[in-house]
Amino acid sequence: MRLEKGMKIKDTLKIMCPGTQLREGLENILRAKTGGLIVIGDNKEVMDTVDGGFNLNSDYSPSYVYELAKMDGAIVISEDLKKIVCANAQLIPDPSIVTHETGTRHRTAHRIAKQTNNIVIAISQRRNIITVYKGDIKYVLRDSSVILARANQAIQTLEKYVSVLERVINNLNLLEFQDLTTLFDVVTAIQRTEMVMRIVEEINMYILELGNEGRLISMQLNELVKHIERDGILLIRDYCKDEDGHNEVYEQIQKLSATELLDLDAIARVLGHAGESLVDTLISAKGYRILGKVPRIPSTVIENLIKEFKELNSVIEADIDELDIVEGIGEARAKAIKDGLKRIREQILLNKKI
């Protein structure tokens, strides 16, 4: 599984993506060029900073928020976004809280967000932008057309990266069946998989920002990546020295910086092959990835096969009688494994995806 990065801002963006009632209210204020300051949540920490204004406790409505924003003060909305608690309020945060924002509205918003850890939204009257604050995080909401253009560009980039990854993986598949895989081939495949997954993460952020306008981008993304992450994890499991630590290895690869990811030796170190020559070191696959592509073979049977034979090449060379003695494999399943591996080999030789 991918590491959850930026969860705070992701959860925040979900409640104000296009198509939501909150976003509609924000867009109305933006179009009217009145500016505004909105706090989400009416807990004690927030209400202690509120001075003046008037209590409403009225049902939330985008048009109500738009009308109330015409006044100078802040609007406080309940945590569940169902009630407008108060309007035209003056917010008095702790002045000792450091902020580098300019403009009274944005300085107040940043300080309130830091002080209460609530979501605070500042809508600029002159610059016509929506800025979201949550704790120390600041995020500028962009127009849907801008995000859509960037998402489409990212999808085009992803298509090229997936195409390169497929060529690398097909080459690796061929070498695995010939038992000629080098450390260079393995780390290149892992590097390319991680590059693809990082672009996927970026596109997922765009989809989150687009809300219901991001459905087509989401469909394109799902069609492009399919089982890439799963195969990447199995690839790591095939080649990392500590078989039980493959999930930790995957996490370490995700934590590599963009510069470190370009260094194949750095990836080899994470796999447990530090100091080994990338080109000269032959390395055999355990077989999790290829055996996982054989139809109707449970993961427990794959585990038993690898426990018995240690390497993929030993499984390929084993006859039906040798396969039959493995726990969970009868004669019928042994034949299915032999036939399945034969078909996969033929597909690889024909340069087809498996």
From Swiss-Prot:
GO biological process, one term: DNA repair
One MF term in the entry's GO annotations: DNA binding
Named cofactor requirement(s): Mg(2+)
Catalytic function, reaction form: 2 ATP = 3',3'-c-di-AMP + 2 diphosphate
Keyword flag Protein transport: no
Function: Participates in a DNA-damage check-point that is active prior to asymmetric division when DNA is damaged. DisA forms globular foci that rapidly scan along the chromosomes during sporulation, searching for lesions. When a lesion is present, DisA pauses at the lesion site. This triggers a cellular response that culminates in a temporary block in sporulation initiation.
UniProt record similarity statement: Belongs to the DisA family.
Designated name of the protein: DNA integrity scanning protein DisA
Native source organism of the sequence: Clostridium botulinum (strain Eklund 17B / Type B)
